[in-house]
Amino acid sequence: MRRASLIVFLSVIAAFASRPPVIATAAPEVTFTRDVAPILHARCVVCHRPGEVAPMALLTYQDARPWARAIKDKVVARQMPPWFADPAVGAFANDPRLSAEDIATISRWVDAGAPQGDPKDMPTPPRFTEGWQLGEPDMVVELPEVRIPATGTDYFPTPSLTLDLKEDRWIRAIEIRPSNRAITHHSVIFSANVSAMSAMSSTGMFDVLGVWAVGTPPTVYPEGTGRWVHKGQMLRTNLHYHPNGTPQVDRTRVGLYFGKGEMKKEVAAALAGNVTFSIPPNAPNFELRSVYMVDQDINIVSFFPHMHLRGKDMKMTATFPDGRQQTLLNVPAYDFNWQLFYYPKTKVPLPRGTRVDLVAHYDNSAANKNNPDPSRAIMFGEASSTSEMMFGMFEFTADAGVSPKPSTERERMEALVASLPADSSFLIDLPFGPSGLPAVLHLPRTGEGAFYTQVLGVILPQPVAKLQWEGNTFQFNTLLRILNPAAGYYTVTGTIGDDGTVRGKLQRLGNNARPQPSFEYSGAHKPKG
């Protein structure tokens, strides 16, 4: 037995000894021409080329070599290419992120001393369209010339003009071209003959027509879809410039590309947002909320989150009529310097009755390196990037018909109360404004409640503090943020009747030495269905 075992053992040793030795082979050297240039050409040079917004070109080895270490640092940290959507939420057609393999290739190239490689391996640089990226437009609109002062705070002119159209047309694409990109932060074009927020208030839709910002390509709508521009249409603008020490001039042009035949679906825009907030000084994580109610079956085709320098993160979540929830967009590390649209690879369907909650956080502390003054309370404002904004815009098409149907303030609040528990939610009328202000009370016997009002078309949940119940009578305190002199702190009382109606009073809080106004309100349950 031992002899047999020994024979087997010796046979195994002999077999291994007779094999040729295994020689380790080194990984092939990573070179710029063969390995790195294709990555940069595919993902980076749309901005990193002469005449564009990036501070350096990366088209050639001579361009890239001085920046090799910085390139590695930026791509390893995933700061370049710029992209801020949570990769675990959704899939987007314009996601420019590098793969892990591409990042490893760039890292190996830099660590090896950034060798050039064989010039014969160098790919042909991509060809870019000079001038209009989408080709010659069907109509070019020139905005009035803007003169930007050499110094001072950021400059926000708002020129407007009327389109010279002989008939209504629909556009399949729009391209915005500032003439002086070195100082231009963004150019936003609105199609409303009134302010965009006034249009949002009256229709529930936000009439933004196009946006130019660093990293934002021209807008091309899905096949057969587009936006209307009308005879006599006024284009309003919001332009943003950075003074750079010398007087500058910009003349922005807008290229319109008309669709052919009948438009199958009109693309509309809407948003959740907040326009009445105040962020306290030195607040490191101040939260703002807003709600949008979907009042028809729609499909989302793009998202556009917007805040300013103190913006920290933003999340958009849908609660469907059956109670299911889905995160639509999550931007965990917002960067004001990059105003990006996010285009889903497939349309995102939202049925009628879906509630979209927008939650954003702001860092008004000294720890925020972009914060110009943490000692100030910060209000909503469009006229400066040192103020703040909170908008989660999205573009969509409606399932029914060609164009989405507009909605009134009351219809939007009716949709909201129908989405809440019927036994603890009431649609009420506040005695503010020429025709009253519809609002919603959500007052559960346990847990957190909310007082929903609407300002310029956006629904704002106001906190409910010290909610107390005694039988069918309740009382709570709230800060009523509305665009009305009656805005302020209130104690709200009310009684629920056996028939589901509610009546009560808002008592203004203030100096006890002076009488404060009070307002009566009434309303009722709005059961689902």
Question: Whereabouts are the PLM-identified features?
Answer:
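N-terminal secretory signal peptides that target proteins for export/translocation
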Residues: 1-2
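Bacterial N-terminal signal peptides
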Residues: 5-19
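Aromatic- and Gly/Pro-enriched helix-to-coil junctions and flexible linker segments
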Residues: 16-166, 173, 177, 232-238, ...
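Exposed beta-strand and adjacent loop surfaces of beta-rich binding modules
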Residues: 55, 171, 184-186, 251-253, ...
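A short, structured loop/turn motif at beta-sheet edges
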Residues: 101, 228-232, 320-324, 349-355, ...
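His-enriched metal-coordination microenvironments in redox/metal-binding proteins
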Residues: 134-401, 458-459
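Extracellular/periplasmic ectodomains of large secreted or surface enzymes and adhesion receptors
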Residues: 393-428, 528
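Central antiparallel beta-sheet cores of small beta-barrel/beta-sandwich binding domains
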Residues: 417-497, 503-529
